[in-house]
């Protein structure tokens, strides 16, 4: 059985994220993306603002690295839910956490993303200042 097209899109953006392929990541996002991060009250709105947040516009690497091991993707015509374990490194420290991501998808592009975890406070503490 083949993946739903939106599940395949979620898998592709996960692979692009893990490999640092910012072009593939940007191609998967709508220009007016709403990006909701774990532990942040306000979303990042727009591809340009998201690129600035992650340093993609400067060419400089971010002060941390994150990869995710995808466990499952559930999809329909409007949404995907991805379950993963994230592995982060920052300033010589490492941190693993579970994450659920929900994508709203329209016309083959991710228009909104929400991320949730089992320990928001630990995530905020780890990434403080980033």
Specify the residue positions occupied by each region the protein language model found.
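Short, low-complexity N-terminal intrinsically disordered segments enriched in polar/charged residues
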Residues: 1-31, 126-130
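Short beta-strand segments enriched in hydrophobic/aromatic residues
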Residues: 29, 86-88, 101, 117
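Short, cysteine-centered beta-strand-loop-beta hairpins and adjacent loop/turn segments enriched
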Residues: 60-63, 88-96
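Short, surface-exposed coil-to-beta transition loops
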Residues: 66-68, 95-100
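A short hydrophobic beta-strand element
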Residues: 76-86
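Low-complexity, intrinsically disordered terminal/linker segments enriched in charged
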Residues: 113-130
């Amino acid at each position: 059985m083949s993946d739903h097209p939106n599940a395949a899109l979620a898998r592709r953006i996960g692979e692009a994220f893990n490999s640092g392929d910012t072009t593939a990541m940007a191609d998967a996002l709508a220009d007016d993306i709403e990006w909701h991060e774990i532990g942040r009250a306000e979303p990042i709105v727009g591809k340009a603002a998201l690129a600035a947040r992650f340093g993609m516009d400067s060419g400089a690497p971010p002060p941390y690295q994150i990869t995710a091991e995808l466990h499952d993707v559930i999809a329909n015509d409007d949404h995907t839910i991805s379950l993963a374990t994230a592995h982060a490194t920052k300033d010589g420290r490492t941190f693993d956490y579970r994450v659920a991501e929900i994508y709203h998808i329209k016309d083959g592009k991710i228009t909104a993303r929400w991320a949730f975890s089992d320990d928001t406070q630990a995530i905020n503490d780890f990434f403080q200042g980033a």
